[in-house]
Structure formats: structure tokens, C-alpha cells
Amino acid sequence: MSTAKKPLVLVIMDGWGYSTKQEHNAVAAAKTPNLDRLARDYTSTLISGSGLDVGLPDGQMGNSEVGHVNIGAGRIVYQELTRISKEIKDGDFFQNVELAKALDSAVTKGKAVHIMGLMSPGGVHSHEEHIMGMIEMAAKRGAEQIYFHAFLDGRDVPPRSAQSSIEQFDALFARLGKGRFASMIGRYFAMDRDNRWDRVQQAYDLMTQGKGEFTADSASEALAAAYARDENDEFVKATRIGAAAPMQDGDALIFMNFRADRAREITRAFVDSDFTGFARAATPALNFVMLTEYAADIKTACAYPPTALVNTLGEWLAKQGKTQLRISETEKYAHVTFFFNGGEESCFTGEDREIVASPKVATYDLQPEMSSEELTDKLVAAIKSGKYDTIICNYPNGDMVGHTGVFDAAVKACEAVDHCVGRVTEALAEVGGECLITADHGNAEKMLDEETGQAHTAHTNLPVPLIYFGRKAEVLEGGKLSDLAPTMLTLMGLPVPPEMTGKPLMILK
């Protein structure tokens, strides 16, 4: 009989940053006896999860996709935001083959160009500068009918901040003498990632048929009406703007979000021939271009295909003959699998995956503990099974509840995670396993935007904790997320592949 394995577990507490400011800080306000004890009694430090350290522009807040890609890669991975922004600046963007092909086809046939995406300066799922660049490109290549279908953010930026973006787009349309807003809807509907197809359908029907709950003559008027209905940007209901601009056969549709997880569902509604999420009233034959590859099995043109990452942690562990488990709730399952593996959808040899359904509630402040207890039940069972050399687990609570802006709920979310961390370390102590506890980016430690006085629902660029529950060790300061994979490999007594440029942060005594 084979010897039971003593796993090294990586616990990622999503959206759990560190701030010296105590006010409006859900992490500090929460009662976290387990994490307090672990930070006191074991080796701990702070590491960076934002800006240049994760391949984003200087000062740009981190996010879950970027964080998990960097953790899994063991090197700084330059992000699509940085890559596309640079190409717009250099002019290369305007020569992009797939974008040009879709635009030219529409222009030749006298068809419309539809552009959809998250209108936001947030830089997490999209950047409005990219969308503006796309509108300029369409105009330069001779498109006469340019329609922008705006998804509103209010999550990675203040909850009511879309008006300044609207004004910038209106100024662009005026300067070009062409183009306009055709529709507006909150990201809550258009960018679902949890198979809530009733939400997605509202965005789909709005864009394809001009069918919305509300109509307005301008985007500013649409937003003012939404605010009068007490809808923040994220939750703005389907609104048609101006005359209906339904999508027709032969039109071009370009999706300007660069982050995959919240772009997949709406994309599948447009491009999958065997789509079953909801009954589509209209299925126009469009020249659909996704800005980046949202999933390997989505068969449509892609402006910026992925650049392959060789020897990510998952791939390297498989090559070393090690077993691994990836486990999280629905909300962060893609992050511990697809993103952690550098955009690789399939499992490596010896890699198991376990998903726990996130609760079906409208917003997670209504159930801040989410499914953390069930997730921990499965994680503890996996630790005690003796089957795995390493386990990667994500607790979504700090991030998902932090995004709601509800302080008391975020405090409860942090307390729920702390309770679970206590259970995990207790199970590891029983089997002689070890644990690294960290986060991918900040969020819950800042719940009020002091400048606007609004709830702070976005991520932060603050550092995140790193605690090593294991042997006695000294820590190298100044670490970042890309140092975690080399740290894990070193603790497991394994070589670090040359592609990983991160450094091991724990030096065993």
C-alpha cells in the first residue's frame, strides 16, 4: 500500500488585502482568531499583487484572473490590458488582421458595425480606451453605421461613475461625425458567469432586437432614469437608446472585453450553434470577433490569441509525477483551473478538480459565508485522503462580498473564511501537511471610497498577506504573486523550472 501523502495546500483568500487604515476595513473589523494566531506564531509577510509586479500598468489594481495567472506561472505575466494599450499607442492595434477583416467585410456590404463591452476605466475586464480605439478604427475604415452597446460597471469603479465615461464617448462620436450609443445595460446582466441565463437573455435580446425594458433618447438620459429608479451602474436594466439598431445578417460584432470569465456566456449566446441557455428569438449571422480567447471551444475569430505559457506550476508538478487537486466554488473555479494553468482548459496528468456550487442569491451580501463550509468539508476530506501532494483552494468570500459594498456583510465574509482556515490548518496538523495562505488582490480591506463618499466596491492595489504554516523558515521580503510557485516547489523539495523567474520566499532553517 502506498504511503499517505502529506499535502502542501495553497489557500487563496480572494480579495483579502492588507491596509494600515482601520476605518471601513472589513478585514481589520472582522474577528479572525485563526489568521491572527497563524500570523503571530508562524512565518508571515506581505507580498504585492498589483501593478508592474503582476504585468499590469504601474499602480493598476490587481484582479482575480491576473492574480491566478501570475501565481500559477511563477513569473510575471504581462496582461492583455498592458499589451493592447501598448498596441493602441504604437498604432499596431489599428492593423490587427481579425479586426480589420470584420470591419472591411461590413463596410464592403454596407452593413453595420456593433461594438459591445464594459464601458469602464477599471482595467479589470476591459478598458474604455480600447473601446474608443475600436470605434476610431471602424470610422477610419469607412464604417458609416457604428453602434456601441455599453455594459455599465459600478463594481471595479465607484457604483455611480458611468456619466464621465458617457461624456467621453459622446465627445468621440461628435468628433468622428459618426457612431452612437445603441443600448445600455448593467454588467450584472451582460457579464454573468454562473449560468444565470435569464440575466444574459436580457442583454442578448436588447442588443440583437433592440428589446429593452426602457428606452431613452441619449445615454445620459438613460443613466439619469436608471439612477431615478435607484439602480447603480452594475444593475442598470436593459435600455434601448435612440432608434432601434437590431443586429442583421452580415453585421460585424466586436466584443471588447479582454478578460475571459465574464465574457464567455454572452459570447456563447451569439456564436454557439447548439446553444441551450435560453431560446434565442433572433440569431443573426454576424462576423463576431472576440478581443481575446474566452475559451478554446468558442469557435469564432479572435483578435489577440493567447501566448502559450510553458511549465506553469500545474504542468511542472505533472512532469514531476505529483498529484494535485484544484478546488473552489463556482465563482472562482475558473481561476484555480483555467487561469492558474495559464489559460489551459484541460487537466494535467494527476490533476483532479472539484467544484462546489456558489449559493443562488441575487448578491452575496445576502449570504456572506457563501458555500465556504461545504468547500472546507471537501478540502479537509482531500487533505485526509492522503491522495494529493498539493492542493490549490480559493475562498471567494472577501472578493465577492467586498464587491457588494456592504460593510457588515464583508466582515461576516472574512470571519467565515477565518473559521475555515482554522479547520484547514487543524486537518493539516493531523496529517503532517503544510500550508501557504495568501490572497490574489485586495478588496474587503477598503469598503468606502473617501473621495466620492460612495461604497468602495472595487479591488485595491494594496499588498496581500502570506503566511507559511509549516516548518521553521525565514522569509525574503519584497515578494510578489509570481514568487509563490517557486516557493511551493522549494518547500516540496522539487526543482524550479527555468521558465519560472520568481524566487522562493521561504528559506527553511
From Swiss-Prot:
Catalytic residues (positions): 64 (phosphoserine intermediate)
Domain of life: Bacteria
Listed EC numbers: 5.4.2.12
Keyword Plastid: no
Cofactor remark from the record: Binds 2 manganese ions per subunit.
Pathway membership, UniProt: Carbohydrate degradation; glycolysis; pyruvate from D-glyceraldehyde 3-phosphate: step 3/5
Family: Belongs to the BPG-independent phosphoglycerate mutase family.
HAMAP family: GpmI
Protein name per its UniProtKB record: 2,3-bisphosphoglycerate-independent phosphoglycerate mutase
